[in-house]
Amino acid sequence: MVDPLCNYNVLEAIFSYLELNDLYRCSQVCKSWYHFLNDENSDVWRWHCLRKLPKESVKSDLLASVSTYKTKLRAYLHAWSPNDCSRNVYIKPNGFTLHRNPVAQSTDAARGKIGFRQGRHAWEVIWEGPLGTVAVIGISTKEAALQCHGYVALLGSDDQSWGWNLVENHLLHNGDMQGNYPLLNNAPKYQVGERIRVILDCDDNTLSFEKNYEFLGVAFRGLPDKKLYPTVSAVYGNTEVSMVYLGTPLDG
């Protein structure tokens, strides 16, 4: 008779050396393997997390909203893309925070590594430096520009991007101001360091926001059936913006 502990240790050793795509396939093999991999704080996920993430990020307060090794790893895989941002932006060693270099008369943007066309997705955006005259968060397709001359609301300036300008509390799309947001009398302005939760519903084709766990309402409806990416655009030199992917939003 095989010792269950021995079987567990063998699986742990094997799964720790597989690629992440292979782990998903393994979870579909049988109930036993599914339950084994469903433990998001197991040594398997710990090993993969520590192997992929920078050490400084694993226990960082930035990842306070993703408490397990598996969700931390998932957040890292969805973070800002160093290959899909303005030349005036770089991604810091923690993997989650972008830094805009102090380049005059330029507006610069960055997209996440992974876009979405199906399902419901949520991520947090934390502006960790000054906003400047324009600071926009939202989504875009791959066709949206990531850099332009001047200090403008780049995100939302064309038909391939949708954004919320945190400085003026305006919604922007196709170069037009779509209205005030949120729809509150004397809506408070964003304070540096606050976490804003972005909620993209690809089933209902809507984009919404939350701040301080308060739902602010649907910002955009009728989004196209295209792959949409988390995006921000910034103008202030040396400002920094972090993004943490959370997964499927919890209702209520």
Swiss-Prot record:
Q: Where is the F-box domain?
A: 1-48
Q: Which residues form the B30.2/SPRY domain?
A: 58-250
Q: Which domain of life is it from?
A: Eukaryota
Quote the pathway field.
Protein modification; protein ubiquitination
| InterPro entries (alphabetical) | B30.2/SPRY (IPR001870), B30.2/SPRY_sf (IPR043136), ConA-like_dom_sf (IPR013320), F-box-like_dom_sf (IPR036047), F-box_dom (IPR001810), FBXO45-Fsn/SPSB_families (IPR050672), SPRY_dom (IPR003877), SPRY_FBXO45 (IPR035784)
Record-level GO cellular component terms: cell cortex; neuromuscular junction; nucleus; pole plasm; SCF ubiquitin ligase complex
Which processes are annotated in GO (biological process)? negative regulation of gene expression; negative regulation of synaptic assembly at neuromuscular junction; neuromuscular synaptic transmission; positive regulation of protein catabolic process; proteasome-mediated ubiquitin-dependent protein catabolic process; protein ubiquitination; synapse assembly involved in innervation
Keyword Acetylation (UniProt):
no
Keywords, in A-Z order: Neurogenesis, Synapse, Ubl conjugation pathway
Q: What Gene3D superfamilies does the record tag this protein with? A: 1.20.1280.50, 2.60.120.920
Q: Does the keyword Chloroplast apply?
A: no
Where is this chain's protein located in or outside the cell? Synapse
Family, as annotated:
Belongs to the FBXO45/Fsn family.
Q: Which PANTHER family match?
A: F-BOX_SPRY DOMAIN-CONTAINING PROTEIN 1 (PTHR12245:SF7), SPRY DOMAIN CONTAINING SOCS BOX PROTEIN (PTHR12245)
Q: How does it assemble?
A: Component of an E3 ubiquitin ligase complex composed of hiw and Fsn.
Q: What biological function has been recorded for the protein in this entry?
A: Required in the presynaptic motoneuron to down-regulate the levels of wnd and restrain synaptic terminal growth at the neuromuscular junction (NMJ).
What's the protein name? F-box/SPRY domain-containing protein 1
This chain is encoded by the gene named Fsn
